[in-house]
Design a protein with these regions (language model features):
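C-terminal terminal-subdomain/extension
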Residues: 57-103
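Compact nucleic-acid interaction/catalytic patches
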Residues: 3-6, 10, 14-53
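Generic secretory/membrane-interface signal
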Residues: 2-3, 52, 62, 91
Length: 103
């Protein structure tokens, strides 16, 4: 499993959050058995920096819900559906900085 890979949500909230994107680098994930993921939401309002829109290949646009970031066991992430584009990857760090940065 690679950083920025997109997986179907294995949890119960699949209607509102059909996908999860892995943001943790590969090195850490192989040592911990978990990955840090950000939910990709449907029916959510995009908040410019904190919750930007991203494209899931073959599935359309979703909202990167950074405020719901969490860790999940790697064994629960199966059947990768794609990878975030370089443009969409570039939206993650500014979103994290906006949430945890000093202002």
């Amino acid at each position: 499993m690679a950083q920025f890979d997109i997986y179907p949500n294995p949890g119960q909230g699949k209607i509102d959050v059909p996908f999860l994107v892995v943001i943790q680098n590969n090195h850490v994930a192989t040592h911990t058995g978990t990955s840090i993921v950000i939910p990709l939401r449907t029916n959510s309002i995009s908040l410019e920096t904190i919750c930007p829109p991203v494209e899931v290949p073959g599935a359309g646009q979703f909202v990167l819900s950074l405020i719901e970031i969490f860790a999940i066991a790697n064994i629960r992430l199966r059947n990768r559906v794609g990878t975030l584009s370089f443009a969409d990857r570039g939206k993650i760090k500014p979103a994290i900085d906006k949430v945890i940065g000093e202002y």
